[in-house]
Amino acid sequence: MYSSSNSFLGGVNNARPGQPPFMQQPPYSQFPQGQQQIPQQTGFQPQPAGYGPQSASHLQPQPTGFPTGQLQPQFTGFPGAAPQQQQQQLGGYQAPAQQPQFTGYPPQSQPPSLQVPSTTGLPTRLAPRTSSEIANSFSDGAGVAPPPPPKSSGSKIPNIRLSFITAQDQAKFEQLFKSAVGDSQTMDGEKAKELLLRSRLPGSELSKIWVLSDTTKSGQLFFPEFALAMYLCNLRITGRELPATLPDKIKNEVSSMVDIISFGVPDTEPQASARTNVPSFDAPLLENKSAPPAPQHPKPQQPSNAQFLSQLAAQPTGFGPQATGLQPNQPSLLGANAALAPQATGFPGQSQQQYLQPQPTGLMTNPQATGYNGPRPPLPPMPTGFGSNLSSMQTGGLVAQPTGIPGQWGFVNAPSSGLPNIEALKQQLMPQPGREGGFTTAGLSGNASIPWAITKEEKKIYDDLFRAWDGFHKGFIGGDTAIEIMGQSGLDRKDLERIWTLADPNNRGRLNMDEFAVAMHLIYRKLNGYPVPNRLPPELIPPSTRNLNDSIGAVKSLLSQDAENRKASGAFLQPQKTGVSYLKEHSFRGGARSPGFGRKDATLFKNNDEAAAGYRSSARRRMGNDARPSSPAASQASEEELSVEQLKKKIRETQIMLDAVDFNDENRAEEDEVLDRRDRLEAESLMDRTRRVQDDIDTHPNAAFRNLDNGAERRALRRQLQAFEDQVPQVASEVRRIEREIADAKLELFRLKDAKAHPNSAANIVGTGPGGTVTEADRIKARARARMQARAAELAGRPVPASVDDDGAAARRLEAESTSIRADREKNEAMTRDVEESVREFTRSLEDSLKEEGETSTREHERRRWEDALGVEDVIRDFIYDLQRGSRTAHVRKEEESRASEQRLRHEEPSAGVSRLSPAPSAGSAGSLPGSTHEDRVAAARERAQRRIAERMAAAGLKPHTDTSETLLQRQEREKREREERLRQAEEEDAKREQERQRRLAEEQRSTSNAPAKPVGKKPPPAPPSRRGRTDSAGQAEVKKAAEETVTAEQAAREQAIREEQQAQEEETNRLEMEAQQREEELLKEKEAQEARLRALEEQVRQGKIRKQEEKRRKEEAERLAKEKEAALAAQRAEIERAKERERQLQLELEGLDEESSSDDEGPANITPEDSTPTQSQLLPTVTPAAPVSAPESEQAGSPEDTSSQAPPVGFSSETESKNPYFKITHQAADTQVVSPPPAPQPNVTSPRADVHSTNPFHRLAQQESSKPVFTGSAPLERKSRARPEADDDWSAAGSEFDSSDDDDDERPGGGSAKQLASILFGTMAPPRPLSAMDDKSPSKSSTPVQDSPVTSLPVPEPNGSLSAPAAPPPPPPPPPPAAVPSYDSSVAPPPPPAPPMAPPMAPPAPPPGPPPPPGPPPPPAPPAAGGPPTPAGAPDRSALLASIQMGKGLRKVQTNDRSTSSSAGRVLD
């Protein structure tokens, strides 16, 4: 029965050498092998069980062990390995799963008598062994070499694609990295340096590359870091700059891959060997598809004896319930240990000499070995008892060992020394009263070796913490509580944030028990010096999360597969016809083998009417467990008692009931037919309404917009947009290349020009440096060449060429030109970037507009149903196809009408001749474009673009370029042919549709004509019909069936015709699409050519405009300079002449003062005619400058202020008096603030004239100076020049001592010597009228030698002053402007007429306008009136008068003060 079991125990018949029994313990003793081994024939190895050497006579040998041929070995490992063999033991001992068995004496202090000297033969190997090694230790070691250590698989690089390099480069880098590092995971610095130096980059660049690549700062490079270094080297080699910091995307990719490599554990599992009796621990785990890798221990542990012992599972050495007891011949000499009795652990009922090997247990002198007596194991024996050399070990402290997959929770090799500081951490984090007051983190930190996975003890501590804080048993801990717990660890806030992120992957804001354990474990690792990982390693993923993710993935896969199946079978359109079951199954792995497979559910239920049966008495409820009761006896008796008459009566009643049922059925059939006809009529009416609505939609003006949602067109437009978007970078790069070439050409052209302009300059040196730069060697060669040329010229007698230019000047010129070229290039580059950005934004907007928004599965289903006629009846399908054909026909017609109207508009547009209204037709046509086809829109866009180009070229004065590829007539002919073709197709479709409609109407009429006959022939009379009616109904049914067959045949024929028509339409549609695509390509080519020509023309226009502007600016500059020079010369000459005339006039006046004795009253009356006549006579020789005044006259005539036409010249002349811009600004400000009427209009009128050309003050001043020579030689404006400086009262008070007196005179009228002098001066000029008039102008000119510019105002008032000045004062109501005008016009306006003949007639009317405005009298009469009484005092002040006349300002001040005293002047005039 057990004959074959020995093959698994390594015996003689063992067919698997090298595979010992699982977990068998070899003997261990301090004695030689010869003394331990007792010859025996059993199949077990002797096994010590007990203490050291004792007296052999004290204990009775106890037989233990099993017979070789009848007993199976006992398994103490994983319980699921050999369950059948364990069940075959006859009442034997059953080892409980995972239950360690102790075969020695419990640990206690050992008396000295038991001490045994340690042997020297103790094996020194204490390293842990795997289960395979322990199993191999039981086999024969002769000729069987120990298994070789697993070969290193080399550096493992994760199969992760780096986005910043290509796949080919990554493969090359992987090969290079593996060849450089061998079996290591990292590349040391020296090897990396050797590889990086091959790039021949400078050391500074390689240093930057190393700093950026070594992300871990470890002095070594992982593969992703090495790939990053290669990528950066490639960047630098290609000429691009290195980034200061790595982009976040690259940094995250490199860090993630480094973490994956760091967390990875090499797979050291040996190869699968032949099947042995060793139980397979992986069998129950085969279904786990996502087993995590083995955990990586940061620091390897040196296993201890306790660990070694704990890895060995004890074996039962016999059957448990066996008789034990002391043998009668055993003396009690054990002392305190006398209670231990030898126990019989063998198989009772067998001869000890035959089957069992004696095995003493308890205290004995020589431990006897039991077990298999086979070949010696190749490994040292393992101790299983309390040996003398292990006296210091405590065998009681055995640690439970993992029996699952490494890396799972609670199954990790904990450190031998335990987890330090874990209890302190627990006490620190436990909820305590008064913890708010503060806490200390002392004693929490350390440097212990902590694995990635969570041990059982650690998990238990964390669970206790969780339960302690989860007082309400919610199953989770909130964020606030977690902050309080984790904050007591003393870690930084950033580390705690990262730990929380890792522990709460779903971002729920709370932690369950497993997630809390993960957080605490990470905190514990951080306190012991381990960094917080960037991502959670597989060992720390909670089982609940892992299982949930697997479940979710399985559900998703099931749903996706179900959706794919339904989509492929069309189940989502007709769910009841697919046979797909929608019953919810609770098993993810059941599939077709699940118990519920094949059974029908409610989603597929269909009632089987034929299976329905009538009443069965056997289906009644049975009473109790008895058999079916018999029918009631009463009914049997009643049936037996019925007579013949009663039976006949029952038959008649039954017949009546059957006839009534037939009648009801026929009535119901009629009602159903009526309802069917009504429904059919309603459906037809609905279809008619639908047709009418569709026709209204097709004929509506805005019907074109509904075609915008065409999916095919959207996709075509998206593809076209993508093609254009792909061309943008190419065009931009081409533009940049052309810009570089232009810049280089400009620089080279400048070098050539500079070399031609400066022959001996250093600019003609040809640079040999990078980029054509001139190096120092080039300069040295050029200087040497120049010296040689100079020597050659000296020897030849030629003059030595002098170097008029040095190296610095040439370099500066070249640098300036390079800077300007660079600036232009940067500006163009910025424009290019702006264009790219705008194109990108426009592309994004187009993409957003082309996206199919709101496209859900329900909407897709409905659209396919009603637009593609899927999942509907045949009648509805035909109706939908009919509507689509009608829509296409109407669309073609509308398109032709819109095109015809557009052509009419285009023909009418040029005839109208209005270029500005041209966009209106294009806007109108654009409104109808969305409804038209793609080709029409392209053609319309091309036409609009050509029209805009023609308008721009016409505006620029260029002749538009006509496209010679296709003339207008050819294009019109082609479009006409296409239009006729489309009309013909539309008419054919209309004819087909009409024929179909007529055929359908004829069929309906036939069906309606046949339909009434059926109910007439079938409807019976009201009386109960006979049974014959059933045969008639059967005949009618056959007729119906024949009619249905004919209808079906006709319908099949119609479907075939419709199908052929659809195929023909599809072929026609494909042909039209191909033609449209060809036309579109042709149009695109034409558009590109047109755009190229347009760009060239625009560039020519722009260059022409620039040249014209440059020429115009140069001409204006030359004219302005010439005018300025001419004006300056004319002003100087006029000033000299005025000074001479003024001086002569003053001399004559002084002589006249001595000779004249006229009264003061006569002076004012005679001054006005005296001033007017000589001024006119004086203007005769100076009329020559009147010609250039036409421009100012036209400007002044066009000014809005015509009423004060004479004020502008005054202001203009006053402004040209000073060339200081600050004085002009202050003077204008003072003029605007003066309250007196005369100066008010001057700045107001002057400022608009100055602003006509430019707002720049310097430009305006230049214009004023350029107009100076136009107004030279005007004598009568010298009084105006005296009146002008009154605005300078407060600014030029330091001019002379008379200015202060003038200021006083402003305050008190009639006082001051200046007024007296002026009255004396003007009074003495009365008798010699012509002479005094001429002298009056000369002294006035000489009195203003510095401010000569008032003369320039002369020509301007001549035309305006002679005609409009006298009429200007009376009309305007406001006093200030008229006051200013008559104040000048009464005395000065009559003198300056443009022509001498006009002056005498204009002189007499001048006094009449003077009296009406008393507030504004003429300035000359006013001083004598105000200073009339003190006139005699003027004689002694002649020297002061001359000084004031020479000063100029004082004399003008007098006149200004006289104007302010308008009341006295009015009295004098009266």
UniProtKB/Swiss-Prot annotation:
Question: Where is the region Disordered?
Answer: 1-157, 282-305, 343-377, 614-641, 794-864, 886-1087, 1099-1470
Q: Where is composition skewed (Low complexity) in this entry?
A: 25-48, 77-101, 348-360, 627-637, 917-932, 1181-1195
Q: Does the keyword Electron transport apply?
A: no
SUPFAM superfamilies, alphabetized = EF-hand
Compartments (UniProt record): Cell membrane; Endosome membrane; Cytoplasm, Cytoskeleton, Actin patch
Compositionally biased intervals (Polar residues): 54-75, 129-139, 1169-1180, 1243-1269, 1340-1352, 1457-1470
| SMART domains with a match to the protein in the record | EFh, EH
Task of the protein: Component of the PAN1 actin cytoskeleton-regulatory complex required for the internalization of endosomes during actin-coupled endocytosis. The complex links the site of endocytosis to the cell membrane-associated actin cytoskeleton. Mediates uptake of external molecules and vacuolar degradation of plasma membrane proteins. Plays a role in the proper organization of the cell membrane-associated actin cytoskeleton and promotes its destabilization.
| Subunit details | Component of the PAN1 actin cytoskeleton-regulatory complex.
**What's the protein called, per UniProt?**
Actin cytoskeleton-regulatory complex protein pan1
Q: Which residues form a coiled coil?
A: 633-758, 963-1159
**Cellular-component GO terms for this entry:** actin cortical patch; endosome membrane; plasma membrane
